Amino acid sequence: MAKKLYIKTHGCQMNEYDSSRMADVLRESHGLELTSDPEQAEVLLLNTCSVREKAQEKVFSQLGRWRQLKQSRPELVIGVGGCVASQEGETIRVRAPYVDLVFGPQTIHRLPAMLTQAKASSQPVVDLSFPEIEKFDKLPEPRAEGPTAFVSVMEGCSKYCSFCVVPYTRGEEISRPFDDVIAEIVGLAEQGVREITLLGQNVNAYRGSIGEGDTADLALLIHYVASIEGIERIRFTTSHPVEFSDSLIQAFAEVPALVSHLHLPVQSGSDRMLSLMKRGHTVLEYKAKLRKLRQVRPDISISSDFIVGLPGETEADFQATLALVDEVGFDHSFSFIYSPRPGTPAASLPDCTPIALKKERLAILQGRLRALEIAISRGMVDTVQQVLVERPSKKDPTMLAGRTANNRVVNFSASQDMVGQFVNIRITEALPNSLRGIVLDAKRRCA
């Protein structure tokens, strides 16, 4: 019987990608197969996020639950990776001394050697180095887990927004070579993948080397990905407004496979707050980019991220954010109360805003965003949407689920052998977090 590996993932899509690569590398080196039951595993890995304080505390809550498993099975190996590992380092073992492995986002390719060392020596192993692109050079070919896949094209961020810990935990921006990205996607397409999501902390800063000192930007990469046989949908995330270029907007005009959905975090509708956040752009510049984009893709869905309660935020600043939300008409978006991250410039700003007021503002903002999202969903009822059938529905395994081009989950009744096909679905109902529909026909079979 194959030995088992359990991975718990917190945070962003980049972490989901990293977790899949952890599974790939340990499957190849140690014959470990993924399990959904931690009690059946001999290795437990926690891939962490440190963007917000609550996410960080979730790490230690999870480790506390795993401690009981370690006490009953001392040979069990527990590892902590991701951004909390990078930020906290040895402190993790101070709070949870039963942890065997601590590794950063850039060292997951070293997991086989770390695991072997920990088992042989019964001593903890910590590797928080930043070996840049080496991570991708040493990882095995990815295994497709369905008709959609994430592909990391760059890591890190060099923007140093005042509130953000990512540059300190993921490092500076490093782009993968163009040919390496294309080769990975070709391999996934050969395994039946039909939709690719290109990932990066600041993905539109991608500048992949293509030989003789030349580089390819994200727009050029998208054009080439669209030409790969079998790839019929392309998404990318997460974007920074500063580098959302005219060439990328032109890609939306020229590449039909690039979906009509964009996640473009703005964080605030106030120029004063954007300056305090060190975002590098104004509200007017942000809106100008969206205006250009909508000229070439009138139906595009725009989602975003928002922070309320950054130290110094006034009522006028908050009202400016609400005004931007109404003007743009954002689709499903994420919003949070500012959480000070150690070592970031914003953490040292004086904060005189009561937490009760921050919570009130967040509730108002989320209510406004939710109303827009519901209106968009209801507007899709009685329309026909092309959906890539991804998997059985999470809520009802007798149904199937897939996503529309604008990133809506649709649940519908159909035969299981339709997974991997594009189908036309008439939307019949808008539910709080998904849509329901009926299949009209299969557009094409995905081999």
Swiss-Prot record:
Catalytic activities: N(6)-dimethylallyladenosine(37) in tRNA + (sulfur carrier)-SH + AH2 + 2 S-adenosyl-L-methionine = 2-methylsulfanyl-N(6)-dimethylallyladenosine(37) in tRNA + (sulfur carrier)-H + 5'-deoxyadenosine + L-methionine + A + S-adenosyl-L-homocysteine + 2 H(+)
Domain TRAM positions: 378-441
Cofactor: binding details: Binds 2 [4Fe-4S] clusters. One cluster is coordinated with 3 cysteines and an exchangeable S-adenosyl-L-methionine.
GO CC term, one of those recorded: cytosol
Any one GO MF annotation of this record: 4 iron, 4 sulfur cluster binding
The EC number(s) this enzyme carries: 2.8.4.3
Alphabetic keyword roster: 4Fe-4S, Cytoplasm, Iron, Iron-sulfur, Metal-binding, S-adenosyl-L-methionine, Transferase, tRNA processing
Protein name: tRNA-2-methylthio-N(6)-dimethylallyladenosine synthase
Organism, as annotated: Nitrosococcus oceani (strain ATCC 19707 / BCRC 17464 / JCM 30415 / NCIMB 11848 / C-107)
The organism's taxonomic lineage, starting at the top: Bacteria, Pseudomonadati, Pseudomonadota, Gammaproteobacteria, Chromatiales
Gene: miaB
